[in-house]
Amino acid sequence: MSAPAISIQNLTKIYPIPFKREKVVAVQDLSLAVEPGQVYGLLGPNGSGKSTTMKIVLGLVSPTAGKTEIFGRDSRTVESREDVGFLPENPYFYKFLTGSETLHFYGKICGLTGAKLRERTRELLALVGLENAADRRIGGYSKGMLQRIGLAQAMVQEPRLLVLDEPTAGVDPAGSREIRDLILDFKKRGITVLLCSHLLGQVQEICDRIGILHQGVLVREGKLDDLISIESQTELILENATPELLAEIQAAVAKSQARVVEQRKPQTTLERYFLEVTQKP
């Protein structure tokens, strides 16, 4: 059996407050696992410990107690991060470099050179849909384009694990949809994704499993479908149902102990509706 992509065991992080005898517990006794190939959503309100957890997994912050592993290797070691790509919230790029030069720069950091580096740069620009902006300076990119070049740099070394902190922050609905589709494409490629986001509708569309943090404590964790299912209700979706059939169903329900709580027409999502009326034909 293969090791989890991410294993977090009894993780605690406490920050002392300087010049005071007080402490802030950012994460408390957190344990969870992200299996290879999953898209895992780490959710919670601001200050719940999401970013702290991500930083500990990436070796950017040391834990007070507990341990984290990446594909079975201690995440504090440099070797464990060879298989990891990271997109932080609000990433900073050198604004006078072009998109192509930016990926070339990160490729060199990852040890790529020559023809392989040039080919990888072209592949990534195509992957994130920025071929036509390859020679434009980063300073002229929109927020959505910056996030996409950020995803491209996270993919430079062909990682098995992507850690994404608010990848759609500040992006309009069209850009958000493009990033969502990229994450789904990563999933098809077998890449594991640990995602932190406040956009719950998007999380519902792309995540296999979620964990919800509140005040540093994991309050809910499991498969998304299991967590959002309402056990006492059953949704019945019919196509081409005649009025007579609906009347028969309602009569059968009336004879039983169940009751019809709601009958309504299917709805699209606000995101889809917005895109339909704002995108050019």
What are the roles of these predicted feature ranges?
Residues A3-I6, K13-L195, L200-D208, I212-H214, ...:
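ABC transporter nucleotide-binding domains
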Residues L224-P281:
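Short, charged/small-residue-rich alpha-helical element at the C-terminal edge
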Residues M1, F19-R21, L236, P243:
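Generic structural hydrophobic/aromatic packing signal, biased to beta-strands
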